[in-house]
Amino acid sequence: MLEQTILEKINQLEQQILVHSIMYYRLGASIWDDFMYDRKAKELQSLIEANPDEFKASILYNDFKLFSWESGYDLPLWDSHYTAVAIWLVEYHKQQGGTV
């Protein structure tokens, strides 16, 4: 299995956190519990602090440059692409018998 680069991991976490913030704040749904969100957000925060140059090269740098692990409320919750992903994930999770 190939190991992710730091930039790839930052990009992945940014996108996951944005999608799950859209689910929580806009759709009133969540497939992550608070512990999972906190774990992912703290991991991203640590990567950002330890790797500022890689962070500046990330896909969502402008949206995450003021990010704090405590909340995703100030992220771009109205982004149409990530909203579509969030809606799809909620529906998929429901179809698989999960609760949201």
Residue ranges of each PLM-predicted region?
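Phosphate/adenylate-binding "loop-and-lid" substructures adjacent to NTP/NAD/dNTP-binding pockets
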Residues: 1-100
